[in-house]
Amino acid sequence: MAKEDCIEMEGVVLEVLPNTMFRVELENGRIVTAHISGKMRKNYIRILTGDKVVVEITPYDLTKGRIKFRSK
């Protein structure tokens, strides 16, 4: 799938799940399950509860996403 099709939204990490999965609450109040992108995994970027993140969501499944960036 092309990257232009993805929807980017900001959110806050609510819960850390096993296998580098996270429960994220988006700006609009929707809760999604997200995993870390490959570059973040490669560079050992840690994500904790309460971190602000940017999540990419596909229009096909609005309940799953990929964490693209962690704000400070």
Curated annotation (Swiss-Prot):
It comes from Francisella tularensis subsp. tularensis (strain WY96-3418). One of the essential components for the initiation of protein synthesis. Stabilizes the binding of IF-2 and IF-3 on the 30S subunit to which N-formylmethionyl-tRNA(fMet) subsequently binds. Helps modulate mRNA selection, yielding the 30S pre-initiation complex (PIC). Upon addition of the 50S ribosomal subunit IF-1, IF-2 and IF-3 are released leaving the mature 70S translation initiation complex. Residues 1-72 form the S1-like domain. One of its GO terms (cellular component) is cytosol. InterPro entries: NA-bd_OB-fold (IPR012340), RNA-binding_domain_S1_IF1 (IPR006196), S1_domain (IPR003029), TIF_IF1 (IPR004368). The gene is infA. It holds the Pfam family eIF-1a. Component of the 30S ribosomal translation pre-initiation complex which assembles on the 30S ribosome in the order IF-2 and IF-3, IF-1 and N-formylmethionyl-tRNA(fMet); mRNA recruitment can occur at any time during PIC assembly. Belongs to the IF-1 family. This is Translation initiation factor IF-1.
